[in-house]
């Protein structure tokens, strides 16, 4: 298909005038519910390419009827390729039946045409499936990404559509087209729908309690032994926005996550956070402030039981800001303050401060980089449990050929405790984490995409009991809808 793609604009320079075809029209679904703020725009091929436009003399233009075209496969192909790129529904519907009759067909072009046809017929689910199949084969085609984003938008898959439009925005230079994308993003932000995100990963941890090397001793003190466990990790996030006038909104959110080990239930845990507040948003900026309440249940660890019990409560407030500095740079910042109260371990009662900032760079729609810094201060009644931690995070994501995608993240944290513990050591830890995740963009099960991850953690410390390293491989699946 790549050779055919490279020939696209060369072929499209050969004039072809078809009966009842309007080349510049942007196709929209029959049941189009797009708000009036988004107008039908002429998105010419030059919107997606730096190829120079050429004026085509009238003497090079020929006019053929549909029956005459059926005898000219090369002309049909020359018309179909730019029709696909220009999102021209009428031309695709005219040429696709003719193209299907020819003995030699390009499967990529055929699937693309079917995606446009399915969208026009109102079968958005099938259209999206076709687009995802194409994306798995080549994620670099910007017209393809735009059409996928459109289909997701009209199918009310809001978060997925937003991701595609934001990626597309990084590679578009045409101001008119950027304005269209911003209108889509603004409309997505104003939709007052529930947003759901679910996740599941299979756990296989051979060092649940982060134990040091077996037999580690400090004087007469002996470190705890490793415990292992297999199970599942789960998460659920739900959010709803209610738009107000002048870009303001109110928001309700719920976040829940936990771990269930079927062969070591003493380490089962679950956390739930509920919050709501106010915010302000445009196509490129979103700021929100909301109080929250959090509850945690825990079975107790090595000294616990097989039943989870209420472990701790938190009450706090969080400020979040996301700002597109340019079409390729984004900064995300969060500030959080909370009060912690424990049911049994009262010496851990106190408050905490958390500040996080992440800078994203998206040089193109198939790649992103980020660098982030976090500061966390935990104040507890027992000062040997109080600490402050500084973290540096780095990451790189890439969509490769043949449908493969990858994500690599690295973090380094420096944690220093305020006072000496019972053994007489003021703990100072350096914590390293590396995670590599791989998945195939065209592999889905009931709408869920499986991802394979390898995770390595290492802790070095002046306290021998807190030196350990471990690695694990696990499968995770998730979906946003």
Swiss-Prot record:
Topology of this chain in the membrane: Multi-pass membrane protein
One Gene Ontology CC term in the entry: cell outer membrane
Keywords carried by this UniProt record: Cell outer membrane, Membrane, Signal, Transmembrane, Transmembrane beta strand
Chief location: membrane
Transmembrane segments: 194-204, 223-243, 248-257, 271-281, 285-295, 315-325, 329-339, 353-363, 368-377, 390-399, 404-414, 432-441, 448-458, 471-481
Cell location: Cell outer membrane
Stretches the record annotates as N-terminal domain: 24-192
Region C-terminal probable beta barrel, residue ranges: 193-481
Signal peptide, first to last residue: 1-24
Domain notes: Consists of a soluble N-terminal domain and C-terminal probable beta-barrel in the outer membrane with 14 predicted beta-strands.
Function statement: Required for correct export to the cell surface of some cell outer membrane lipoproteins.
Family of this protein: Belongs to the Slam family.
Name this polypeptide is given: Surface lipoprotein assembly modifier 2
């Amino acid at each position: 298909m790549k050779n055919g793609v490279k020939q696209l604009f060369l072929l499209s320079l050969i004039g072809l005038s078809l009966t009842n075809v309007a080349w510049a029209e942007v196709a929209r679904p029959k049941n189009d519910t797009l708000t009036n703020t988004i107008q039908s725009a002429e998105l010419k091929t030059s919107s997606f390419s730096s190829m120079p436009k050429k004026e085509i003399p009238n003497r090079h233009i020929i006019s053929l009827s549909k029956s005459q075209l059926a005898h000219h496969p090369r002309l049909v192909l020359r018309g179909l390729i730019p029709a696909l790129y220009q999102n021209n529904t009428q031309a695709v519907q005219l040429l696709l039946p003719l193209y299907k009759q020819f003995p030699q067909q390009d499967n990529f072009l055929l699937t693309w045409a079917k995606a446009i046809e399915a969208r026009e017929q109102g079968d958005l689910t099938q259209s999206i499936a076709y687009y995802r199949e194409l994306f798995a084969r080549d994620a670099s085609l910007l017209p393809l990404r735009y059409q996928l984003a459109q289909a997701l938008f009209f199918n009310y898959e809001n978060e997925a559509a937003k991701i595609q439009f934001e990626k597309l925005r990084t590679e578009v230079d045409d101001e008119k087209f950027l304005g269209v994308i911003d209108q889509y993003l603004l409309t997505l932000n104003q939709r007052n729908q529930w947003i759901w995100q679910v996740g599941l990963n299979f756990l296989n941890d051979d060092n649940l309690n982060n134990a040091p090397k077996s037999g580690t001793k400090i004087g007469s003190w002996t470190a705890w032994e490793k415990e292992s466990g297999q199970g599942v990790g789960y998460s659920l996030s739900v959010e709803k926005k209610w738009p107000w006038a002048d870009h303001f909104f109110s928001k309700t959110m719920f976040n829940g996550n936990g771990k269930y080990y079927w062969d070591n239930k003493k380490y089962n845990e679950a956390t739930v956070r509920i919050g709501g507040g106010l915010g302000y948003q445009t196509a490129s900026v979103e700021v929100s402030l909301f109080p929250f309440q959090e509850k945690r249940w825990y079975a107790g660890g090595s000294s616990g039981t097989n039943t989870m019990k209420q472990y701790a409560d938190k009450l706090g407030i969080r400020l979040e800001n996301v700002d597109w500095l340019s079409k390729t740079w984004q900064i995300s910042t969060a500030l959080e303050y909370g009060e912690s109260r424990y049911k049994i371990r009262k010496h851990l009662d106190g408050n905490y401060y958390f500040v996080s900032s992440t800078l994203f760079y998206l040089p193109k729609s198939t790649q992103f980089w980020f660098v982030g810094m976090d500061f966390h201060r935990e104040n507890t009644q027992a000062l040997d449990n109080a600490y402050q931690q500084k973290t540096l995070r780095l990451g790189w994501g890439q969509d490769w050929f043949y449908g493969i995608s990858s994500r690599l993240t690295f973090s380094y944290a420096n944690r220093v405790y305020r006072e000496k513990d019972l053994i007489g050591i003021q703990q100072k830890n350096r914590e390293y984490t590396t995670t590599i995740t791989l998945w195939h963009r065209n592999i889905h099960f009931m709408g869920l995409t499986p991802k394979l991850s390898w995770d390595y953690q290492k802790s070095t410390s002046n306290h021998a009991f807190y030196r350990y390293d471990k690695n694990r491989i696990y499968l995770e699946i998730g979906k946003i809808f």
